[in-house]
Amino acid sequence: MDNKDSILQRIKKSVKTTDPDATVILYGSYARGDNRSDSDIDILVLIDKDKATRDDQKRIAYPLYDIEFETGFVISPIVFSKKVWETKHIITPFYENVTKEGMVL
C-alpha cells in the first residue's frame, strides 16, 4: 500500500495531466491529519472555465479510479470553476471548510 504523500502526488499528477491549469486542493480529514483507515481523500479541483460541467467532472475523476483501484484508497473529487469559487457571492459551509483547512497540492 502506498503512503499518503505518494498517493497525493499521484492524484496531483493525474489531475495536472488532464488539466495543466487546474488547482488541486486537499481538504477534509487528510488535510486536518485526523484521517482513519476508512477515510476517503477529499479533493477540490478548480478549473479555468466559467462553469464546470458534468463532462469536466468525468474528465478529472475517471483517471483517478485507476489510483483508487491500485491503492485501495477512496478518492472523492469535486470539480469547480475557479471563477465561481473565487467570486464568493455565496459563502457556504463547504467553502468555509475548504478555505479554513484546505491545502493546495
Tell what function each PLM region has.
Residues 1-23, 31-33, 37, 48-105:
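Catalytic core of pol beta-like nucleotidyltransferases
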Residues 40-46:
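Short, aliphatic-rich beta-strand segments
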